[in-house]
Amino acid sequence: MLNGHVVNYGKHRTRRSFSRIKEVLKLPNLTDVQTESYKWFLDKGIKEVFDDIMPISDFSGKLSLEYVGYKLQKPKYTVDEARDHDATYAAPMHVTLKLTNQETGEIKTQDVFFGDLPLMTESGSFIVNGAERVIVSQLVRSPGVYYTGDYDKNGRQIFGTTVIPNRGAWLEYETDAKNVSYVRVDRTRKLPLTVLIRAMGIGSDSEIIEMFGQSDTLQFTLDKDVHKNPADSRVAEALKDIYERLRPGEPKTTDSSRSLLYARFFDPRRYDLAPVGRYKINKKLSLKNRLYGQTLAETLADPDTGEIIVKKDTVVTHEIMDKLAPYLDRDDFKMVTYQPSKEGVLPDPITVQEIKVYSKVDPEREVKLMSNGHIDADVKHLTPADVLASINYFFALQDKIGTTDDIDHLGNRRIRRVGELLQNQFRIGLARMERVVRERMSIQDPSTVTPQQLINIRPIVASIKEFFGSSQLSQFMDQHNPLGELTHKRRMSALGPGGLTRDRAGYEVRDVHYTHYGRLCPIETPEGPNIGLINSLASYAIINKYGFIETPYRRVSWDTHKVTDKIDYLTADEEDNYIIAGANTPLNDDGSFKEDIILARQKEDNVEVTPDKIDYMDVIPKQVVSVASACIPFLENDDSNRALMGANQQRQAAPLINPHSSLVGTGMEYRAAHDSGAALIAKAAGTVEYVDADEIRIRREDGTLDKYTLEKYRRSNNSKSYNQTPNVKLGDHVDESDVIANGPTMDHGELALGQNPLIAFMTWNMYNYEDAIMLSERLVKDDVYTSISIEDYESEARDTKLGPEEITRELPNIGEDALKDLDADGIVRVGAEVHDGDILVGKVTPKGVTELSAEERLLHAIFGEKAREVRDTSLRVPHGGGGIVQDVKVYTREAGDELSPGVNTMVRVYIAQKRKIQVGDKMSGRHGNKGTVAAVMPEEDMPYLPDGTPVDICLNPMGVPSRMNIGQLLELHLGAAARQLGIHVATPVFDGANENDVWDTVRQAGMDKDGKTVIYDGRTGEPFHNRVSVGVMHYLKLTHMVDDKIHARSIGPYSLVTQQPLGGKAQFGGQRFGEMEVWALEAYGAAYTLQEILTYKSDDVVGRVKAYEAIVKGERIPKPGVPESFRVLVKELQSLGLDIRVLDMDHNEIELRDMDEDSSEHLNIDTLSRMAEEQEKKKLAEETGKSENKEDSNETADKPVAPADESDGKVSK
């Protein structure tokens, strides 16, 4: 009897699962993070923005423009067409506006075009300029009021408060060493806190003391706040003090001061808390939260009946709070109204709720707790009640009443998703447009003006374009494989506009916080400068309407103390109130806890409690980690640093031509592939009527026919082959949302990132030293690790000043053999095999016309245009770009294709390369066990098993102990057993096969009980001394392939100023011979070698041409001249005003001649025309550079480039 139980993943794969916990909750759809948010934007977000900004009235109030509604029309291109035409997948947006003339009552309604709105594809990405992009969600501080506590050098606790809006000025309170409280308004210099209280209209000291109660801090602050100008009242003076700070040096009046303070904090148009800010402030300041755990200093009675609810001197517990809560929600319970002075910022009465409690510092003293009353959720600005209640909370902290906030707590950080980011951008565009509308209203004739004439959509279009094109959060989608796509869509970044910057982010922000549990993955984050700033959403987490991450828990019944199947989603601050048991806690069949003492979590502590104290229980162990981490079997046996690498490396797996899903999986593979958007999913149930490589047709039960088109060998964003293959047969019955076609790296509907080779952990002739990997030639011969890379190359024929460029087969000075694969138009045929330097698209460009001689003029007159000189500017295969021409696309203006201005024809050629695994490629397992291929050995030389099977891969056993990723060994043994038994297994993270399960399965497979075996040397046939661990592990080939990195320079471009060779593969650059390398040659005394490296091969412009000439003629190479960088140095020093001259041995001045035209003519360097040519090419390249190139090449190729001389410049200084 085998261990575990059988689970079906889709219709085509069965696995034996070792999980022991029943699944009470299905995984949510993994791309909902994106799709739900965009849907909200279309349904509600756009309307919210219009409602905020409209109606727009002119300055006299005659005209008023109102929003009625909007509709999206049919997109111009489908998703595939947008990709092909380098266009944006977007729908035209039409807004219905109503213009009312208030004087005549005339109403004009009109539909106005508001530009194209990019649409989200079904899988959660956008197509912008032909490239697929993802908008990454942003993790930011939530608006609200925050209290911090710190200790000064004398050990006294000092507190600070910050009121953070979504949009608007900050308000900060702080205490100093002398116990005086201060306020900062909008980051200006500080003022005594009582100045702000007086500005609210609470003028006299006695009123302030009555409102806030007597305390040392308040008294010290009042002493500091003296009445300077008796001519002004205290309120007017306070308003002017604040004005003075905000507008220093300007003349101040009471009215202007009042309106400025109003505009900063109380004007709904200028100050916005957003719904989340209002929710957080109401929650923080409400008495419900503040009374808990306090001792009441007054008796509380029912306002209607006078019946006592709670007596004086009672400590408020959970039970008492349950009794009190309904009263605290009433508008007539303990409410106090203050009437501010008429001079205050707002003259309206201020209503707050007040209850007295005893101080925690001095239990005799009464402290008044004040809430901000009951303010509606739709009040987005601050109110005087908010300000006074926040000050009251600040003073109460001195009496140890209230709590300080941790800004890294996920209750205080929220997610801005696509919808909100887009809405903010839309709001910016609309606000810019509003100004234009107002101006036009006052200019145009009110009787004839229409909405269309008032609107200028440019700012809106520009704002949206800018967001999708260049925002830090709009990213080129990672398309190495479906797991990479999915992870990218679920990514949470703390960077970006309004977020943190890499340099300013400290250790605390990056660290794992206890609130990450079930919300953000503690494992998956990049290595390097972004560590901890970019996170991945946990697998079961969802995001609520306020943008806080919620995670599911099973509710424990309060009366029976049994675990129910009722699921509650809790935010981080809700979770702080409960004690939660882990998902592995043993339960009886009826849901009661088996044990008397249970290990549980409470805030950041692990506690041991009795079952009656437990409020909730985890749903499933894998709710803690992200999708990529949940795909690592035996994650619980890996060190977290290596698990992080494993999670990241799975995203870099190159799609293989015949992938196999892992023998040892985790059960997450099916859902990850299904939701990634790479698989083809059935829209409705039915029967397969037709299937081939390009199309699947399914007849629904109601008789309608669905047609599904498969993607064939499309180039993905990362130059990988994106190919779909059918997963169904003729006559199969299909249910809705079944996988009917596998995408790249998929097998039977499951994620299949690599292969399952036979792996031995043994050293072999030092070939696998230091993480090197030794492979069997079988993996090359049988195309086990073969992947396809597809690169596209473009050539454009444009209009130049001298006439149009032409795409043609007639190229000057090119032999017929070079044209053998070109068709009649000069374009390479599909299927041709091309090598470096071959012509892909023949193109000629008119040359500059020089002064013609008499004979040439005669020829010109006889033969017409033909004698005009053209030069060959054909598109050729770049270094390392050879392969098979897979597709050619031609776009012309005549055919109606949209091309950039000045371009008549564009040809795009796709070249596919079949890349077998080879020395230098990077490979990895799922446990962060990465290495590079060091040797590919003949099959017959590989170590073999007793039955003669040669192993496929030899890994070094030394890579395991120090790295502590033992998961790979357990996977190895279980994989071997699974292959022997002919099964696939699933071992979910934290709830999978334990050591006993692994050894039981190994025994059932008839293997030795230690999982090791005798291994024979393939070269001698002798057995090795020790038994070796051999088994099956899922091993991946990563995208870091040696073909993309290998590079050698022959003759190439030089930097314009220093005349030294450029660097990097992208620029066909040289290898830098740096200062330390120079020391090495000096140490050897290799003077001539050093001299040629520093002159001919680098920046001696004249010398390198002469050297080339001498080599060609077979003469002695002349002495080198002065390096160009020396001239540059002299010029730099002269530009600083220093008189620098160069003298020879006899102190005679040497004339440092610049490279003028005479010398270049003498040297036969056509420098100027070449430079002009290069610069023109560069300019064209920049103009046509697609957004994806911007994203992809992070080389610093922006230096000006001088042409390649005929001489060789291998090395730069």
From Swiss-Prot:
PROSITE patterns this protein is in? RNA_POL_BETA
Domain of life the protein comes from: Bacteria
Q: Does the keyword Protease apply?
A: no
Which catalysed reactions does the entry list for this protein?
RNA(n) + a ribonucleoside 5'-triphosphate = RNA(n+1) + diphosphate
* S-S bonds: none
| Pfam families with a match to the protein in the record | RNA_pol_Rpb2_1, RNA_pol_Rpb2_2, RNA_pol_Rpb2_3, RNA_pol_Rpb2_45, RNA_pol_Rpb2_6, RNA_pol_Rpb2_7
InterPro entries xrefs: DNA-dir_RNA_pol_bsu_ext_1_sf (IPR042107), DNA-dir_RNA_pol_bsu_external_1 (IPR019462), DNA-dir_RNA_pol_su2 (IPR015712), DNA-dir_RNAP_su2_dom (IPR007120), DNA-dir_RNAP_su2_hyb_sf (IPR037033), RNA_pol_bsu_bac (IPR010243), RNA_pol_bsu_CS (IPR007121), RNA_pol_bsu_protrusion (IPR007644)
Q: Which SUPFAM superfamilies match?
A: beta and beta-prime subunits of DNA dependent RNA-polymerase
What GO terms describe the biological role, i.e. biological process, of this protein?
DNA-templated transcription
Tell me its EC number(s), please. Answer: 2.7.7.6
| Ranges of biased composition (kind: Basic and acidic residues) | 1171-1198
Gene Ontology annotations for the cellular component aspect, listed alphabetically: DNA-directed RNA polymerase complex
* Enzyme type, top EC level: transferase
Alphabetized NCBIfam families for the sequence: PRK00405.1, rpoB
**Family to which this protein belongs:** Belongs to the RNA polymerase beta chain family.
PANTHER family per record: DNA-DIRECTED RNA POLYMERASE I SUBUNIT 2
Subunit details: The RNAP catalytic core consists of 2 alpha, 1 beta, 1 beta' and 1 omega subunit. When a sigma factor is associated with the core the holoenzyme is formed, which can initiate transcription.
Q: Main role?
A: DNA-dependent RNA polymerase catalyzes the transcription of DNA into RNA using the four ribonucleoside triphosphates as substrates.
Q: Can you name this protein? A: DNA-directed RNA polymerase subunit beta
